[in-house]
Structures are given as structure tokens and as C-alpha cells.
């Protein structure tokens, strides 16, 4: 036979007791949170908190300009002529590959000798060349 399998059958009374405890704990945490938010609102009413509306109003009064950026002459000089930032980059030549032109065959590496069978008939070479060209054909 099975040999002592045990099943945990929950007691309905203990389940209700744990639910009551959870509800009481939730109620306590809600009470604590609401008292903390009330304190925070009172602090803001006294003028100790940060008021984003006041900061926005002050920014409108200043014409949307911040004082810290207007005092920094280096920052303004860089912004007044953005073409100076890219001038040195544009004068340099790009040394990378040009993808508009295919590379010449002399530049391409040779395949290893064991890849290509040495004794090929000329017709086999032509067939292989045709197949390779069709495989490598790039559609524009």
C-alpha cells in the first residue's frame, strides 16, 4: 500500500483567524500611511516643501532662461556656432571600405587548396564560375 502518505488539510477556523489578523494589519498600515500623508500636506502648507508650480511661474517670469546657462560663456560659445563642432570631422577622409564598388579579385584572399579539386575540366570551371556568380549576385 502507499505507506503513510500525509495530506495537510487546513483547519477552517485557523484560516479565518489568519484572515482577521491580515485585515487588522492592513488597517493599521492604512492608518499609519494616512497620518504620514497628513503631516506631509501640513508641511507643504507651511511653505517648507518644494512647489513645482512656483518654479514654473518663476521660469515664465525669467522668459524661460535659466541663470546658470546664461552665465557660462564657454557653453554659449559652443552653441553659437555648431558648424565649428563638425568642421574638423568633415575635413578628414574616411579610410573605410567603399561599398559602392566591389573589391578587385587580386585583393580577395585565395581559398585553401583542399577546398578546390585540382583536376577540373574547363567546362567544370565555367560551370562553377557561373554558379558562384549567380550565388554572389547582389540585387540592387
UniProtKB/Swiss-Prot annotation:
Major localization class: nucleus
Organs and tissues of expression: Strong expression is detected in lung, spleen, ovary, thymus, and colon.
GO cellular component, one term: P-body
Disruption phenotype: Mice are lean, resistant to high fat diet-induced obesity but without the induction of insulin resistance and have a higher metabolic rate than wild-type mice.
Stretches assigned to coiled coil: none
Subcellular compartments: Nucleus; Cytoplasm, P-body
Annotated GO biological process: nuclear-transcribed mRNA catabolic process, nonsense-mediated decay
This protein's record includes keyword Cytoplasm: yes
Region: Disordered, residue numbers: 1-81
Keyword set includes Transcription: yes
Renumbered ranges of motif SH3-binding: 100-106
Keywords, alphabetical: Activator, Cytoplasm, Nonsense-mediated mRNA decay, Nucleus, Transcription, Transcription regulation
Bias kind Polar residues: ranges: 11-38, 59-81
Xref: InterPro entries: PNRC-like_rgn, PNRC1/2
Subunit structure: Interacts with UPF1/RENT1; preferentially interacts with hyperphosphorylated form. Interacts with DCP1A. Interacts with many nuclear receptors including ESR1, ESRRA, ESRRG, NR3C1/GR, NR5A1, PGR, TR, RAR and RXR.
The family this protein is said to belong to: Belongs to the PNRC family. PNRC2 subfamily.
Described function: Involved in nonsense-mediated mRNA decay (NMD) by acting as a bridge between the mRNA decapping complex and the NMD machinery. May act by targeting the NMD machinery to the P-body and recruiting the decapping machinery to aberrant mRNAs. Required for UPF1/RENT1 localization to the P-body. Plays a role in glucocorticoid receptor-mediated mRNA degradation by interacting with the glucocorticoid receptor NR3C1 in a ligand-dependent manner when it is bound to the 5' UTR of target mRNAs and recruiting the RNA helicase UPF1 and the mRNA-decapping enzyme DCP1A, leading to RNA decay.
Domain topic, free-text comment: The interaction between PNRC2 and nuclear receptors is dependent on the SH3 binding motif.
Name of the molecule in the record: Proline-rich nuclear receptor coactivator 2
Organism: Mus musculus (Mouse)
